[in-house]
Amino acid sequence: MQSRLSDWLVKHELVHRSLGFDYQGIETLQIKTEDWDSIAVISYIYGYNYLRSQCAYDVAPGGFLASVYHLTRIQYGIDKVEEVCLKVFVSRNNPRIPSVFWIWKSADFQERESYDMLGISYANHPHLKRILMPESWIGWPLRKDYITPNFYEIQDAR
């Protein structure tokens, strides 16, 4: 069984891979980085007009980083919304993914947090800078290979 979006992508020969369904029956699809821009636009046009959340995680020490998008298709007059989870995996050596800020404005702070914590750079994001850590912070704190500095700058709390 595939989601309607997955069926549509197969029909139009757009490359993706199903990673299965979660406990709520929501399908997770793996999207190639080079296809993410077009599949994001297609998802929006297909009706996934709400970005419920975007997050990122480190898959394994020295391995890939993942940017995860939970999309919801909300249409007037339907009782049950459709949801899909899209994952884009990138190399930690060059973690660059096209931003979807221009499609879903709610991606703004979420992509910035993923950048701040894991170092994933979102191409064409208009405000890509640290959001939680100070600008002077070195490294990406949520990467599994992150080495915590043995010093912390004491800051005036005034």
Curated annotation (Swiss-Prot):
InterPro entries: NADH_DH_suC, NADH_quin_OxRdtase_su_C/D-like, NADH_UbQ_OxRdtase_30kDa_su, NADH_UbQ_OxRdtase_CS
Matching PROSITE patterns: COMPLEX1_30K
Acetylation as UniProt keyword: no
Molecular-function GO terms, alphabetical: NADH dehydrogenase (ubiquinone) activity; quinone binding
Subcellular location: Plastid, Chloroplast thylakoid membrane
Pfam families attached to this UniProt entry: Complex1_30kDa
Gene Ontology terms: biological process: photosynthesis, light reaction
Family stated for the protein in its record: Belongs to the complex I 30 kDa subunit family.
PANTHER family: NADH DEHYDROGENASE [UBIQUINONE] IRON-SULFUR PROTEIN 3, MITOCHONDRIAL, NADH DEHYDROGENASE UBIQUINONE IRON-SULFUR PROTEIN 3
Subunit-structure text: NDH is composed of at least 16 different subunits, 5 of which are encoded in the nucleus.
Function of the molecule: NDH shuttles electrons from NAD(P)H:plastoquinone, via FMN and iron-sulfur (Fe-S) centers, to quinones in the photosynthetic chain and possibly in a chloroplast respiratory chain. The immediate electron acceptor for the enzyme in this species is believed to be plastoquinone. Couples the redox reaction to proton translocation, and thus conserves the redox energy in a proton gradient.
Protein name: NAD(P)H-quinone oxidoreductase subunit J, chloroplastic
Higher taxonomy: Eukaryota, Viridiplantae, Streptophyta, Embryophyta, Tracheophyta
Gene: ndhJ
